[in-house]
Amino acid sequence: MNARHFLSMMDYTPDELLGLIRRGVELKDLRNRGVLFEPLKNRVLGMIFEKSSTRTRLSFEAGMIQLGGQAIFLSHRDTQLGRGEPIADSAKVISRMLDAVMIRTYAHDNLTEFAANSRVPVINGLSDDLHPCQLLADMQTFLEHRGSIKGKTVAWIGDGNNMCNSYIEAAIQFDFQLRVACPAGYEPNPEFLALAGERVTVVRDPKAAVAGAHLVSTDVWTSMGQEEETARRKALFAPFQVTRALLDLADKDVLFMHCLPAHRGEEISVDLLDDARSVAWDQAENRLHAQKALLEFLVAPCFQPA
């Protein structure tokens, strides 16, 4: 299969990733000026959801429509994927009928197996390992507000989860330093840490992580599929709540990001999203624009007239 996929930030070169977020800025400007731009007319994106979603579904579906194409929502409950059809078989059929596939799933191996058997581009809409589309939006948001992130310091506060893993990949590809503050036993995947080398430092003190940082980011303490751990995680992660006082230790021009949905009063203080340093709403909107840039990059242009 010769299709180009987007399963990880490491699938592309740094120049390609920078080009994508710059293109996201351009597409956002076109949208804001009311310019009609439909390079993907008559193209169809399939969206396979094993995990529930608000931002991922809205941004991909609206983005594909705005680019002139269409999007089809497919849940495990409504397809043979949920009844045990092998992933490889499903991929071979689905990719003959669509022009691209976005998958939001649990096991990352589901994505890699689907992509290995797909004729068309496969996009990681989220897996337990990675959330690369969110990082495109985050990097676009930083670019819009502060310019290049190269050489800057980023602090990740909380669970070493899929978002944290993607921040590690972004640190490599966009050349910034990343400090991860998490409780013992909740570090990022060692494979990602090994890949990053000296670009990533793991600490136990959130104050040490945030000191002088140009960007501070966090996520929920309990991800989907971990609900039984909620009480224990709340107790362990309580010292890692991001507050206005914690942000005061960062660079004077620091930005705060959260991929949402946020649990106010848990990983962030109740008032943090309303702080002037928070760009979470721009960050959420940029899922739309960054992913439009990705779709434009991956999906072949419109068909020629017969």
From Swiss-Prot:
Belongs to the aspartate/ornithine carbamoyltransferase superfamily. OTCase family. L-ornithine binds at N162, D219, S223, M224. Its EC number is 2.1.3.3. It catalyses: carbamoyl phosphate + L-ornithine = L-citrulline + phosphate + H(+). This is Ornithine carbamoyltransferase. Its main location: cytoplasm. It is found in: Cytoplasm. Reversibly catalyzes the transfer of the carbamoyl group from carbamoyl phosphate (CP) to the N(epsilon) atom of ornithine (ORN) to produce L-citrulline. It is an enzyme of class 2 (transferase). SUPFAM superfamilies: Aspartate/ornithine carbamoyltransferase. GO terms for molecular function: amino acid binding; ornithine carbamoyltransferase activity. Pathway: Amino-acid biosynthesis; L-arginine biosynthesis; L-arginine from L-ornithine and carbamoyl phosphate: step 1/3. GO terms for cellular component: cytoplasm. One of its GO terms (biological process) is L-arginine biosynthetic process. Keywords: Amino-acid biosynthesis, Arginine biosynthesis, Cytoplasm, Transferase. It comes from Pseudomonas syringae pv. tomato (strain ATCC BAA-871 / DC3000).
